[in-house]
């Protein structure tokens, strides 16, 4: 059974109405009028329609899947290189940290940093966990599940991030 954890349906469909839209991982790329005043843009230009799913499709995707055989986390980290990322397993949690120093872009200078923490299922084999970064900036963290009644041993360790040359197919539900 494949379990996908996502935002509630009402938050996905009406994502542009929530102020938190400004603070997702799509930061630092400039703001549009509908980011600040979503109702004003439709009043001024009634023929202009922002996609209701823009938030989900274009912002930092974080998708967790847990099926019978493995546990997978997909995380959009397109602004970071493998050297900017740190992935650690600490007890029952995986912590992903990304930070890059100040860089110049079209609008000035920008620096980015994020922290994500996910709880690992107790039956994930922590010794076989892998992590890779695709060419399109999708970080894939995965670990196989143990099918016996034994629980996985817990240890604190860093997981190296390997670089893949091909893009990841976008995770789909």
From Swiss-Prot:
Primary location group: cytoplasm
Keyword Acetylation (UniProt): yes
A GO term from the CC aspect: cytoplasm
Residue numbers carrying Deamidated glutamine: 6, 50
GO-annotated molecular function: metal ion binding; structural constituent of eye lens; unfolded protein binding
Modified positions (Phosphoserine) in chain numbering: 45, 122
Subcellular location: Cytoplasm; Nucleus
Annotated positions of the Deamidated asparagine modification: 123
Residues given in the record as Zn(2+) 1 binding sites: 100, 102
Keyword tRNA-binding: no
One GO process term, biological-process aspect: response to heat
Post-translational modification: Acetylation at Lys-99 may increase chaperone activity.
Keywords, in A-Z order: Acetylation, Chaperone, Cytoplasm, Eye lens protein, Glycoprotein, Metal-binding, Methylation, Nucleus, Phosphoprotein, Zinc
Disordered: region residues: 144-173
Regions crossing the membrane: none
Binding residues for Zn(2+) 2: 107
Composition bias, Basic and acidic residues: 153-167
Region (Required for complex formation with BFSP1 and BFSP2): 1-63
Superkingdom of source: Eukaryota
sHSP domain mapped to chain residues: 52-164
Residues at which Zn(2+) 3 binds: 154
List of glycosylated residues: 162
N-acetylmethionine: residues carrying this PTM: 1
Record text on subunit structure and interactions: Heteromer composed of three CRYAA and one CRYAB subunits. Inter-subunit bridging via zinc ions enhances stability, which is crucial as there is no protein turn over in the lens. Can also form homodimers and homotetramers (dimers of dimers) which serve as the building blocks of homooligomers. Within homooligomers, the zinc-binding motif is created from residues of 3 different molecules. His-100 and Glu-102 from one molecule are ligands of the zinc ion, and His-107 and His-154 residues from additional molecules complete the site with tetrahedral coordination geometry.
Cited PANTHER family: ALPHA-CRYSTALLIN A CHAIN, HEAT SHOCK PROTEIN HSP-12.2-RELATED
Name by which UniProt lists this protein: Alpha-crystallin A chain
Organism of provenance: Didelphis virginiana (North American opossum)
UniProt gene name: CRYAA
